[in-house]
Amino acid sequence: MSAVSCSSVRATVAPKAVAKRDVAKAAKAAKSVSLAAPAFAAASLAGPAFAATEALSQTADGVGVAVGGAAAVAAVGGLLIATDPNKRREDMKSSAGGDEAKSVADYFNSTGFERWNKIYGETDDVNKVQLDIRVGHQQTVDKVLDWTAGMDMNGVTVCDAGCGTGSLAIPLALRGASIAASDISSAMVGEAEQRYNAEVAAGKKAPAVAPKFEAIGLEECSGKYNMVTCIDVMIHYPTDRVNGMISHLASLSDDKLIISFAPKTLAYSILKRVGELFPGPSKATRAYLHAEEDVEAALNAAGFKVTRREMTATQFYFSRLLECERA
């Protein structure tokens, strides 16, 4: 079965060895993440927070806010009502001529690429929050690799939708899979291809079929694959588009579909809104949480059943991972 082409908005990268090196550093760093807002100076409890949400973009710029306990959450109620994240989202969309996909692509081809390429690279030039995000994302990627560890990947066709800089596509390709990796950002795709070539040049065995890296949008994704993966991408899709996104990804897979998303719970919704209070000067992405039951219902409607699920939750990153198979 030949790999054709696929894509999505985003997913990202960090070599597994680098993530292991960084785990201890991230754990230590998380203990000392400081509060950036005087209004929350009394907060002290550090639970899973902000993660791949609105707060991710601003914390990636070095702004960190922790909310400690029910009293602190209650204290920000008025501020939450006063903010208007939807207006910021609409302003961003308007600047791209009303095209939401283009606005996301523009971001990840410019400041977004610079930020996330650093976070998911090997550089030590990251702050405490960025380090935590790097480790959290890599933990999610590692879970996918662990789930597929018992599979003979030689000749298996895989569509990595929203490949980012190749954190998942590259190791799967080096295990022999025939990869169609794509992303809406040409900068991300270019970086992924460079990283793959560097791995092969360093002595890693190239697969029989070289991976195909392509900068295209989700709607242009086509073909049939043994497995479709879409990691840390749904956060860029509003609720009214998620069902269509899942249906489209499911139509590409003959056997297996693996996706991740930021789950919508009361606690995470509050933390997301707190993050929206501090958008930061280069804040340019929108972020969406999704109810797990809604995601699973969309998967069932598309002919898939959930066979495995995992949760990754660090200080500043949280992601629900689902493995699905044809029902």
Set out the residue ranges of the language-model regions.
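N-terminal auxiliary segments of SAM/dcSAM-dependent transferases
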Residues: D61-E114
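Class I SAM-dependent methyltransferase SAM/SAH-binding core
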Residues: C159-A161, T165-G217
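Short alpha-helix
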Residues: T285-G303
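Conserved alpha-helix/loop element of class I SAM-dependent methyltransferases that forms part
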Residues: L131-N154
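A short, conserved alpha-helix within the catalytic core of class I
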Residues: Y237-H248
